[in-house]
């Protein structure tokens, strides 16, 4: 990805996932109204436009999209009529990772939509033929039998890796093993090779379902609070990737899937606090879709003790400023969610740290 000239050595990476509501059009006539743009329970167009404008105001060098860019199943027409309307102006800077809503069927809340297996996602980001067939290579990585959109790129002194964790899909033969030679195992081997050959000082990796959750009060209080991928089959990949990144001294992991903002303490692969060698995790799933609820204890503390700070009342994008050997983060709300508290827009989280390399 071409980088614009800079007068200094800092770069801006905007990061967010879980963004665009399903448009209310003829193709989605059977979808319940509560799941489409215009539903009062969703952020809808107002939220996705607010977060897009917030990201644009950051003047980013790149935009890390953390999956579930388009609900409910990410058809190409959905991308064109919803995501594109708000986020299209940043398209050439967007470096996406897919989410479950781009691959899997959606059969909840009275809906029954066929999974797209990544077709709409790749067609939107990589371009497509006149017949709508996605191009095999492009901005979202390769769309082939041997590679389903994992890739890496450099921004300044930073190496950034985008991964596809949607292994419980036809594209991956519904195979979430990282060791059996299947497609996910090949992706995991690619990650190991990519990290071994990296010569940049600092590394960020991102994918959709998080390794460590802030949403599930049961899993958050286990001795190992890792129930990766929010108790899903994708957890095998999340665990394996965290081990590789930890061994390679990666600096940050970014995820979406859980619809709020949460920052975690540096952790080892078992979910233990590790201030010396651990990797901080940021969940930034506050791009526009209906917000989730953080898991808390009776005293108001977070159920997962590794959560430092979090908010589930507003939509927003995280700004990462990448320096040569350090970084800073800044998260500010862009729009309050439905039924938000009076203090929702006063939340903020910012800080800085050195990169691990």
How would you label these PLM feature ranges?
Residues 1-77:
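N-terminal active-site segment of His-dependent metallophosphoesterases
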Residues 205-212, 251-261:
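Histidine-centered catalytic micro-motifs
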Residues 58-59, 198, 248:
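Active-site charged/polar residues at nucleotide-handling catalytic sites that mediate phosphoryl
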Residues 301-357:
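A short C-terminal boundary segment appended to hydrolase-like catalytic domains
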Residues 18, 67-68, 99-100, 163, ...:
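Active-site glycine-centered loops adjacent to acidic/histidine catalytic or metal-binding residues
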Residues 26-39, 72-199, 203, 217-235, ...:
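Extended active-site neighborhood of metal-dependent phosphoesterases/phosphodiesterases
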Residues 13-15, 63-65, 96-97, 205, ...:
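Residue-level marker for buried hydrophobic side chains located in beta-strands
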Residues 15, 65, 154-155, 322-324:
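Generic beta-strand structural signal
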